[in-house]
């Protein structure tokens, strides 16, 4: 499994790579996954729908990532949105 970060102008950057069947490598993947979420990134697992259409499923924890996933892609949350309520 590869953990990748999308970086504008650079494409995909490999953050971590390992085999989830090897406990030490799985721990490293989990730690890297958590660091990205803690940094405010979103995580998505690419999938392929029937008919060949490419999609992605957002995940919020490493436990939600399918064991056979080849990669998880991290990307920044969209900026903006509703203004903060004034107090």
Tell me the role of every PLM-derived stretch.
Residues 36-53:
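Short, basic/aromatic beta-hairpin or loop at an interaction surface
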Residues 51-87:
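Short, compact, well-ordered microdomains
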Residues 5, 41-46, 71-75:
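Ordered hydrophobic segments in well-structured contexts
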Residues 20-21, 46, 64:
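Alpha-mannosidase-like glycoside hydrolase catalytic domains involved in N-glycan trimming
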Residues 21-24, 50-54:
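A short linear-motif detector with a strong N-terminal bias
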Residues 1-40:
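Extended boundary segments
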